[in-house]
Amino acid sequence: MSDGGSPKRMFRGVDHVGIGVGDMDEALAFYGAVGFGDVLFDWTGDVPGTERFTGAGARNARIAMLANGGATPVGPARVKLVQVLDGDGPPPIPEGQAWGELGICEMCLHTRDVWKTHERLAGLPGGRSLMEPLSGAVVPTNVALDISYVSDPWGCKLEMIEWKGLWTSLPGEPRAEGVNHVAFGVKDMKASLDFYRRMGFEERLFESTDFFDPMAPWYDRPIPSQHMVMMMAGQGAAIEPCVLDPLGPDCRGEWGHLGAMEFAVGVTNLERAAAWLSEQGVEVHGQHTVDVGSGEWRYAYLTDPDGLYVSLVEPRY
């Protein structure tokens, strides 16, 4: 393939994070208040590609893609809300999930003024504080940050971060901007980094092997060690794979489960990106085009080293 199809040109970082919710109308109100008030599409139907996760037919769901009007280069990505409508409805958050177990464990929003934004989001109907704001710096880059956590009405962990040593937020009121990164638990850090490096996640912002003590109350078992690495692409949101020791429970859960459950890597051309990854030995499972009214939702699920719910997406909405 020519240089025009090289990973750095075709892949656009994390485009969105998928979050399972129990009631779409309530979720639209909550995330609209968070800052994701631009509804790019709101679609209901059988979701192509999910049949490979169920072993039967595709899941029926209502899906809304939301953008933040205050998105920035360090908070660029979107949120995809998913309400499973068939079967017994939305599957629960995987049992035993604290942070870093195998599966998607959080969505992080870049924020202007973590303290004031934390107070506002924790005070929203259904919102709850999980970690009070604090300041720190990451190693080995020594980039300063403010950080906190809240949860949505269904228990999804929402991290708020302001990378003070990386970016100066634009003027304005305290606010949550777009998605900065998605965090997920893996079994083998090297395998995951090698895999996602093919999609342009090549710049390391930090790497830590120390346990992040403010997370201790989330664990109902002996505290594990944490190996966390944040990798950035040239565009889009970043990824933060984590390996726990011991690994803890499998928290991948069913597709559409409550909380953060999947993410998508943006591409400029779905066919070319899928073909290039296939040449690299990555399993890409079909390519789907869904008419969502405002345009086309074009995507393809792929197999990552840990069987997480990950897709490519070419936004046309």
Show where each model-derived region lies.
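Exposed loop/turn and edge beta-strand positions of beta-sandwich/beta-sheet ligand-binding modules
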Residues: 13, 59-60, 103, 144, ...
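Long, charged/polar, surface-exposed segments that mediate recognition or autoinhibition
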Residues: 93-100, 256, 264, 273
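Ordered, small/hydrophobic-rich secondary-structure cores
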Residues: 37-39, 43-58, 62-140
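Short, structured motif recognition centered on aromatic/hydrophobic residues
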Residues: 14, 18-21, 31, 76-82, ...
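Vicinal oxygen chelate
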Residues: 2-10, 41-43, 80, 108-175, ...
